[in-house]
UniProtKB/Swiss-Prot annotation:
Source lineage: Bacteria, Bacillati, Bacillota, Bacilli, Bacillales
Similarity comment: family membership: Belongs to the bacterial ribosomal protein bS1 family.
Keywords: Repeat, Ribonucleoprotein, Ribosomal protein, RNA-binding
The protein, known as: Small ribosomal subunit protein bS1
Region (Disordered), start-end ranges: 361-380
Any single GO BP term: translation
Cellular component GO terms held in the UniProt record: cytosolic small ribosomal subunit
Length: 392
């Protein structure tokens, strides 16, 4: 009768059952729990108290706490009619954690978790069990030192669940990407052509500079970096430098933003206001020849036009008869059109006119003194047929 009674009592609670009870004792390596409706007390070994590593059971429970756990084993001493339920609180926590995480994965939801440890390959986080954020899934940006996350609560998404292999992979990078996409959409909606905004140089390429304008990058083409000619972006800007940029265009569909630093700077013409005046004689450099004249640079990126009629006192058929690119010349400012940013120049006005007159006179005298009869005009050349009908 006694044996039948004991077996029936034991069979009331079976291995795999979920039980609840109150913590009676907290010892160094285990916790004693009074099981509701149980014949014996329950024992939770320290290794089965938590999904995290603990040194002492008192870190997670105290006397009087109500706990829930799975029965993993039943120990019974028939001779002394004593026994105990071996319990696992950790197994139940892990199961609940997987159910929670699976729901978040299915719904593509963001969760928060505390970083409990920083390891070489990434971050260990508490998600009701040990979760791992690999280094490649920590951020959209390069982060050299992961220790900045130690103890922080971070926003993450479930990337992979594998209960059989106790594998929980999470991603902080996926959340950052969502936030970046939302921020980009907001910025694209708020930007208008002509806006002048602050930014920071994010990276340089051979064709321009990418500027971070609040989480979104826009491109300043190399031709829009400066009013002066630029070979490489490094000549003008450096990574991390704060700059002002003007929005040239916004393509929302392709998420492309064209920017200009040049348009936020004074024009070369504005920089010379008050420096040059009409009738000033200054030095310049011939930069380009055209059939109607020569363009002369008188200040960095400031050019004026010397019309072909203002190149020399004597008639020339083409500017390249007397000028060439790179040549240094003196020019006189004939006029400054500030509204259209044009400057009229003259080389002729800086040349002594007397030299030209003497040259013309010398040519005439040489011609008159030439004894070559072949070059001299005859009376017939001068008067033609006017005397053909006269009789003498």
């Amino acid at each position: 009768m006694t044996e039948e009674f004991n077996e029936s009592m034991i069979n009331d609670i079976k291995e795999g059952d979920k039980v609840t009870g109150e913590v009676q004792q907290v010892e160094d390596k285990q916790v004693v729990v009074h099981i509701n409706g149980g014949k014996f007390n329950g024992i939770i070994p320290i290794s089965q108290l938590s999904t995290h590593h603990i040194e002492n059971p008192s870190e997670v429970v105290k006397v009087g706490d109500e706990v829930e756990a799975y029965v993993t084993k039943i120990e019974f001493d028939e001779e002394n009619d004593t026994g105990a339920y071996i319990l696992s609180k950790r197994q139940l926590e892990t199961e609940k954690s997987y159910e929670y995480l699976q729901e978040k994965l299915d719904n593509d939801e963001v969760i928060e978790a505390e970083v409990t440890e920083v390891v070489k390959g990434g971050l260990v986080v508490d998600v009701g069990q040990r979760g791992f954020v690999p280094a490649s899934l920590i951020s959209t940006d390069f982060i050299e030192d992961f220790s900045v996350f130690d103890g922080q609560t971070i926003r993450i998404k479930v990337e992979e669940l594998d209960p059989e292999n106790n594998r929980v992979i999470l991603s902080r990078k996926a959340v950052e990407q969502l936030e970046n996409d939302a921020k980009k959409a907001s910025i694209l909606d708020s930007l208008n052509e002509g806006d002048v905004i602050d930014g920071k140089v994010a990276r340089l390429t051979n064709f321009g500079a990418f500027i971070d304008i609040g989480g979104v990058d826009g491109l300043v083409h190399v031709s829009e970096l400066s009013h002066e000619h630029v070979q490489t972006p490094e000549e003008v800007v450096s990574v991390g430098e704060a700059v002002k940029v003007k929005v040239k265009s916004v393509e929302k569909d392709s998420e492309r933003i064209s920017l200009s630093i040049k348009d936020t700077l004074p024009t070369p013409f504005e920089n010379i206001k008050g420096k040059f005046h009409e009738d000033d004689v200054i030095e310049g450099t011939v930069v380009r020849l055209a059939n109607f004249g020569a363009f002369v640079e008188i200040a960095p990126s400031v050019q004026g036009l010397v019309h072909i009629s203002e190149i020399d006192h004597k008639h020339i058929g083409s500017p390249n008869e007397v000028l060439e690119p790179g040549q240094q010349v003196n020019v006189k400012i004939l006029g400054i059109d500030e509204d259209n940013e044009r400057i009229s120049l003259s080389i002729k006005a800086t040349l002594p006119k007397e030299n030209v007159i003497e040259s013309d006179a010398s040519t005439t005298q040489s011609y008159l003194e030439d004894d070559n009869d072949e070059d001299k005009p005859t009376l017939g050349d001068v008067f033609g047929d006017k005397f053909k009908d006269l009789k003498f």
